[in-house]
Regions:
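Short beta-strand/loop segment at the start of cytosolic alpha/beta domains
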Residues: 1-24
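Intrinsic disorder/low-complexity segments enriched in polar/small residues
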Residues: 5, 11-12, 73, 83, ...
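Residues at or immediately preceding the N-termini of alpha-helices
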Residues: 34, 112-113
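A short, charged, amphipathic alpha-helix used as a generic interaction element across diverse proteins
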Residues: 115-119
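Acidic phosphotransfer microenvironment of two-component signaling modules
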Residues: 91, 113-114
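Short acidic-hydrophobic, aromatic-tinged amphipathic segments that line or gate anion-handling sites
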Residues: 107-111
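Amphipathic alpha-helical interaction surfaces in cytosolic regulatory modules
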Residues: 28-106
Length: 119
């Protein structure tokens, strides 16, 4: 049984002093996650949220529909000139994200600290 996707936004500051929006996802990411994934991202003020981190550390499962939502988010970010990095993926999902080409749009990191430093 799929668990509901939760998403919340936190504001951090990069080592260079720039504002960073962190989207923290929790639960499973699937076709029913559109509002949590895309809705939360689209609600970010694009003029302020130039740097975005995606936190997958509390995500249990991502199916193919969920991966498609993440790709859509990344394409929208690229079209808006936003820089995105992701962290907290399991080894399996790091491999899957790499295989489907997500790394063309977002660098993948093990920890928030590594991702924040890279932005």
């Amino acid at each position: 049984v799929q668990s509901e996707t939760k998403a919340r936004v936190e504001q951090l500051t990069s080592p260079a002093g720039a504002p960073v929006a962190v989207l923290r996802f929790e639960g499973d990411i699937a076709s029913t996650s559109k509002d949590a994934v895309l809705g939360t991202f689209q609600a970010l003020p694009k003029d302020i949220a130039r740097l975005v981190l995606l936190d997958f550390s509390k995500v249990d499962y991502i199916n193919s529909s969920g991966i498609a939502l993440v790709i859509q988010l990344l394409i929208e970010a690229a079209n808006s000139g936003q820089k995105v990095a992701a962290f907290g993926l399991t080894a399996h999902f790091t491999k899957v994200f790499t295989m489907v080409g997500i790394t063309k749009y977002a660098a993948l990191f093990a920890t928030q600290g590594e991702a924040l430093t890279a932005l």
